[in-house]
């Protein structure tokens, strides 16, 4: 395929067209591109492979170089491996103070994970729109992130206005503010519920209670069916011969309700086939 160089020579070609009269007026960009030409040629040129002109392979230079004593290096030495695994050559791990504070807070308060959270975010930096001079926000619920951002604000404010606080002191101050607000929130919720009950409010069952009720309905039906099948199984064992009655009773005592129900279903299938 021919090398595409038209984009890089647009100024020269336009000048030629203006000179020969193909273009009557200069384009609006002509003077700007002439005053500030591009510094980098982005044309992709094919790599010409000629004998003894190609750069040596770094693998060959590392593992295949000949020494003065006539030996050839075929594997990396301990020093080479040490330099290869050096921390300078590794990609640095990103560490943020916010992540460390979150780890500490949720390690101390694991039940905060059980509170419902909004997982839908537009940009992920909604906390920047909040005023962290106070912890309670209008458009954000009280959670561990409030403690983290409040701690960072206290640290920044103490450096400007003083007295200077350490990280531990700022975290403790934000944590106790969180405790007071959380206790006030739970107290208001409890008082509001008691007042509603006093005025005759009837609260519906929770999702957990509703699930237990539905499960109990199926358990009651199963208990009735299991009781009936147990009676049928005991009656069938009573009709056995007297010689094998002792062994059958011992075997029936060992079988469970589930096994007896399976035996009854198998017997019914045999009767239907006959």
Curated annotation (Swiss-Prot):
Q: Which domain of life is it from?
A: Eukaryota
Which GO cellular component terms are attached? mitochondrial small ribosomal subunit
Keywords per UniProt: Mitochondrion, Ribonucleoprotein, Ribosomal protein
Q: What is its main location?
A: mitochondrion
What does UniProt give as the signal peptide span? none
This chain's protein is named: Small ribosomal subunit protein mS23
Q: Which GO terms describe its molecular function?
A: structural constituent of ribosome
Q: Tell me the lineage of the source organism.
A: Eukaryota, Fungi, Dikarya, Ascomycota, Saccharomycotina
Assembly and binders: Component of the mitochondrial small ribosomal subunit.
Organism field: Scheffersomyces stipitis (strain ATCC 58785 / CBS 6054 / NBRC 10063 / NRRL Y-11545) (Yeast)
Location in or out of the cell = Mitochondrion
Q: Which InterPro entries match?
A: Ribosomal_mS23_fun
* PANTHER family found in the cross-reference section: 37S RIBOSOMAL PROTEIN S25, MITOCHONDRIAL, SMALL RIBOSOMAL SUBUNIT PROTEIN MS23
Ribonucleoprotein in keyword set: yes
Q: Which gene encodes it?
A: RSM25
**What segment(s) does the record annotate as region Disordered?**
233-259
Q: Which family does it belong to?
A: Belongs to the mitochondrion-specific ribosomal protein mS23 family.
């Amino acid at each position: 395929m021919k090398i595409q160089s038209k984009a890089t020579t647009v100024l020269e070609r336009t000048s030629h067209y203006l000179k020969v009269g193909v273009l009557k007026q200069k384009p609006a960009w002509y003077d700007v591109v002439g005053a500030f030409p591009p510094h980098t040629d982005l044309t992709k040129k094919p790599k010409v492979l000629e004998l003894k002109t190609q750069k040596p392979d770094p693998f060959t230079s590392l593992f295949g170089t000949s020494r003065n004593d006539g030996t050839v290096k075929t594997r990396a030495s301990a020093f080479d491996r040490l330099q290869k695994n050096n921390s300078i050559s590794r990609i640095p791990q990103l560490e943020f103070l916010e992540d460390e504070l979150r780890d500490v807070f949720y390690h101390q308060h694991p039940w905060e994970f059980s509170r419902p959270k909004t997982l839908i975010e537009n940009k992920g930096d909604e906390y920047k729109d909040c005023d962290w001079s106070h912890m309670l926000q209008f458009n954000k619920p009280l959670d561990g992130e409030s403690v983290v951002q409040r701690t960072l604000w206290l640290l920044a404010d103490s450096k400007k206005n003083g007295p200077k606080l350490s990280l531990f002191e700022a975290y403790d101050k934000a944590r106790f503010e969180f405790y007071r607000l959380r206790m006030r929130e739970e107290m208001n919720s409890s008082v509001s519920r008691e007042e509603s009950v006093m005025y005759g409010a009837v609260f519906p069952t929770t999702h957990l209670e509703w699930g237990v009720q539905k499960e109990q309905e199926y358990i009651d039906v199963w208990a009735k069916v299991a009781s009936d099948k147990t009676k049928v199984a005991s009656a069938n064992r009573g009709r056995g011969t007297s010689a094998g009655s002792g062994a059958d009773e011992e075997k029936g005592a060992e079988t469970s309700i589930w096994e007896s129900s399976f035996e009854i279903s198998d017997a019914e299938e045999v009767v239907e086939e006959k």
